[in-house]
Amino acid sequence: MTFEQAKKRSLVLKEQLEKWNYEYYVNDNPSVSDQEYDRALQELIAIEQQYSELITIDSPTQRVSGQISEKFNKYVHTSPMLSLGNAFNYDDLIHFDEQIKEFTALPEIEYTCELKIDGLSISLVYDNHVLVMGATRGDGLTGEDVTINIKQIKSIPLRIDQPTLIVRGEVYLSVEEFNKINEERVKNGEFKFANPRNAAAGTLRQLDSTIVAKRKLNAFLYYYVNALQDGIQSQYEALQRLEQLKFKINPEYRYCSNIAAVWAYIQEYEPKRNQLGYEIDGIVIKVNNLNLYNRIGYTAKNPKWAIAYKFPAEVVVTKLLNIFPSVGRTGRITYNAVLEPIRIVGTIVRAATLHNADFITERDIRIGDNVQVKKAGDIIPEVINYVAARRQKNAQKWQEATHCPECNSLLERVEGEVDQYCINSVCPKKITRGLEHYCSRNAMNIEGISEKIIERLFKLEYLKSFSDLYQLEQYRAEIIELENFGEKSFENMITSINNSKNNSLERLLFALGIRHVGQKTAKLLARQFKTIDNLAAMNIEQLSIINDIGPIVAASVVDYFAIPANQQELALLRQNGVKMEYFATNQHLAQKFENYRFVITGVLSKSREYFKELIESYGGQVSESVSAKTTYLLAGTDAGNKLVKAQKLNVKIINEEEFQQLLSKED
């Protein structure tokens, strides 16, 4: 075959394969057999192997990949991917509708309703007709570039009949595919995924794209960014345009002329939620008229023109077979229920939380009882109570544990708390749970070291403390011989461990697992004290006077640094090169708004979350409410009550232009 013949044939094959992809993965109506599709794909692969210059990034062959990524690059979204506020009942919806009417001064509001897919949010960028970027939501401002994995999703077009587009949607797994994946994982001796959402999220973040290709991820697209600029006037019209561009759109969307029609839609789909073949956790309600969005505005985290109606948690009844305690990284004891398997919201549940000993004894829940179970937020199954009318005479009275289930140490209760604690500092489970937390994404962000790997390395006595992570190189020969490990996996793990040495102080403080110190508090402490030595030198009184640090947190921090074992561990971390100071990309800028407290209100050119991140990066704090301690109120249009309160308190009020002047002002 000559080059010209190959070129013509490859164009025909590309067009044909994309058409078949669309029929199969979007319309669910294939016109050819799998064998015919595979023959055409193999023919195109052969042509491109012969003439590599014919390979284009939108070729169907580029979906088939054996690429393994070292890590995913960060991607800054052109506009924030905001979360949605929630409604839980009819009254919440009426309140939402009344607010929209107040913002717009309209007597009736038209809406578009869509099913809320329980998956992982993504953003797709097309340039010159071709998919050039696929990114996860991340924190809403910055996500991860997972383009190579997005290309494995056959329902997502690689080329569209429009020069440019940014479109957002949800990656999900069907219940059928989820069950197949879990069956395969059980055969391979791996842990099962808890639910389809976790499976989809874990798959999309796989570094090995061949694994992604094997799992049949799917995607519904629903948000056309910059639709107004392209002449589209409504959300309903935007969805129709996305359909025309051959994106997979959830077919259940509907135009609703008013809030009563919205409620009717919700009532229709709530009983259908388990019959769809994929999981949903509510209904998304959006103002249909896109021209109203800027007038209605945004909060710091959510658009005011949309809301998510969350279905009430499904409650089922099943038999309680057993109760057993487990211990977490802080030593806190959680009681768990072993259940007769029952289906809740599309998944089989065999276990649920019973929280703490007081929860069980106050309700007199017994082994053998029929119990009510729900999934809290449709994620964590929990026992609510027992069914008194169905209690058997032989139901076994439960006794709370007195000793740790892992190390057999005597359990203790902390004054003022309902929980029991294992206080043994060398409890194996506390150590491994603590290591898992230390390595987690929001802490030191060490990749390639899972819960299973930590437990294996702990049993081999290679890993017993945080500082041991930085000495694993000495066990290279032994570790690469472990099952499911190897040279490449080891190198990736060591690289990530070494990278963690350069984290800023707030990550380390959160990773250490200091009681009551979450991400927000860790960031506040890091910015305030700059080094771990400065923080360790503080007493309870000095810490308590800091904004948002109360006496409980202060006491916990002081107690942590007073323990000799913790002092020794910090010294070892320092010896291994772990940085223990706070730093930003520019230290001078990071102090610009030091001791300044901002409140943000009204409609601005960007989301409140954008301005919050910006202020915090310059060392400032952002509060939700105006007080005498507020330094500046950053006010956009439609500022409302916060503006009135700021005026009464003589708080300095600035607009966006004045805020930019503050940023650029020389110190």
Curated annotation (Swiss-Prot):
It catalyses: NAD(+) + (deoxyribonucleotide)n-3'-hydroxyl + 5'-phospho-(deoxyribonucleotide)m = (deoxyribonucleotide)n+m + AMP + beta-nicotinamide D-nucleotide. GO terms for biological process: DNA repair; DNA replication. NAD(+) binds at residues 34-38, 83-84, 114, 137, 170, 286, 310. GO terms for molecular function: DNA binding; DNA ligase (NAD+) activity; metal ion binding. It holds the Pfam family HHH_2. The active site is at 116 (n6-amp-lysine intermediate). Its cofactor is Mg(2+); Mn(2+). GO terms for cellular component: cytosol. It is an enzyme of class 6 (ligase). Keywords: DNA damage, DNA repair, DNA replication, Ligase, Magnesium, Manganese, Metal-binding, NAD, Zinc. InterPro entries: BRCT_dom (IPR001357), BRCT_dom_sf (IPR036420), DisA/LigA_HHH (IPR041663), DNA_ligase (IPR001679), DNAligase_adenylation (IPR013839), DNAligase_N (IPR013840), Hlx-hairpin-Hlx_DNA-bd_motif (IPR003583), NA-bd_OB-fold (IPR012340). Residues 588-667 form the BRCT domain. CDD domains: BRCT_DNA_ligase_like (cd17748), LIGANc (cd00114). It comes from the Bacteria. Zn(2+) binds at residues 404, 407, 422, 427. SUPFAM superfamilies: BRCT domain (SSF52113), DNA ligase/mRNA capping enzyme, catalytic domain (SSF56091), Nucleic acid-binding proteins (SSF50249), RuvA domain 2-like (SSF47781). HAMAP family: DNA_ligase_A. DNA ligase that catalyzes the formation of phosphodiester linkages between 5'-phosphoryl and 3'-hydroxyl groups in double-stranded DNA using NAD as a coenzyme and as the energy source for the reaction. It is essential for DNA replication and repair of damaged DNA. Belongs to the NAD-dependent DNA ligase family. LigA subfamily. This is DNA ligase. It comes from Spiroplasma citri. The gene is ligA.
